[in-house]
């Protein structure tokens, strides 16, 4: 089984404003999962996530429910900066997605949402993951410029910028800029074309909408 721990701050005023503490909002309550729900499951029939002292914890041994047990914010966001710290157990594998649409025609968050990878450095029985699948990667699209991932059980930090006005995305992993990318346009289309997501148009679960939603 795997365990993932996360705590999160979000800044939604990153566009043309000076950042200050008042711009940031804490997304995780001191207890419970208020403000969050399981993907396509607002009735909370799924399990696996818990909140311990303001830290979100996923324990796969407690997972129940069919299909995807990803956790989704109740609020929808478009352009933002998000800061969070995370650590995983040995073999842990997770990720942060944006632009996720929960229409029932999409069976998984990755049908629509691009992902910044969260991964144990020794994932897959100690073998080194594909660079585009390593921690800090824009999953299967861009490998991080530098591997700064820490060992399982140690805290990592992400500061992720998604700015649709400037058409700009950025990942800072443990204080180091590891990737920059466009969110749409020719360069984005080319990345998708050369990835596993290029075939999603032919699959019933995707409907060809990967990376198409600016709000989610």
Spell out what each predicted region is.
Residues 14-216:
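Carbohydrate-interacting regions of secretory-pathway proteins
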Residues 1-19:
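Bacterial Sec-dependent N-terminal signal peptides
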């Amino acid at each position: 089984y795997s365990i993932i721990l996360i705590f999160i701050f979000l800044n939604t005023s990153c566009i043309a404003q000076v950042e200050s503490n008042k711009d940031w909002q804490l997304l995780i309550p001191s207890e419970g999962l208020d403000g969050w729900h399981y993907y396509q499951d607002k009735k909370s029939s799924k399990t696996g996530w818990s909140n311990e002292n303001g830290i979100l914890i996923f324990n796969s041994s407690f997972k129940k429910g069919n299909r995807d047990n990803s956790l989704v914010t109740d609020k929808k966001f478009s352009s933002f900066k998000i800061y969070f710290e995370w650590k995983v157990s040995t073999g842990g594998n997770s990720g942060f997605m944006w632009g996720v649409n929960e229409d029932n025609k999409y069976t998984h968050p990755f049908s629509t949402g691009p992902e910044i990878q969260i991964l144990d450095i020794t994932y897959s029985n100690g073998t080194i993951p594909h660079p585009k699948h390593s921690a800090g990667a824009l999953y299967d699209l861009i490998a991080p410029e530098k591997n700064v991932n820490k060992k399982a059980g140690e805290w990592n930090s992400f500061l992720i910028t998604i700015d649709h006005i400037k058409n700009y995305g950025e990942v800072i992993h443990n204080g180091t800029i590891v990737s920059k990318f466009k969110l749409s346009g020719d360069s984005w289309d080319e990345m998708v074309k050369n990835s596993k997501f290029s075939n999603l148009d032919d699959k019933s679960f995707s409907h060809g909408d990967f990376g198409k939603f600016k709000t989610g």
